[in-house]
Amino acid sequence: MFRRRTRRGGADIHVADPTYDDWAILRDFEDLETGLAFRDQLRDAGIKAVLTSDWELDRFRRGDIALRVEAADYGDAEVLLSGLDDA
């Protein structure tokens, strides 16, 4: 199990980590920077979110990246990212 670390000590992406296999996939991304932006939006809203990949990213920080949330938070996360939240 591998993790790429942020400057703040948290994991940017969880690689080959089965811990999050039961979490719902909300979006897929090809580059880490875009994935981090979406993940951080969810975290700022109080939703637990992580980025996962089955394989290491390439040298350009690209790969098959999944944005995951806990199943109970899927609906709220989808509404937030879709811009449909009226509140």
What residue ranges belong to the model's regions?
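Acidic/polar low-complexity segments and flexible, solvent-exposed patches
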Residues: 1-87
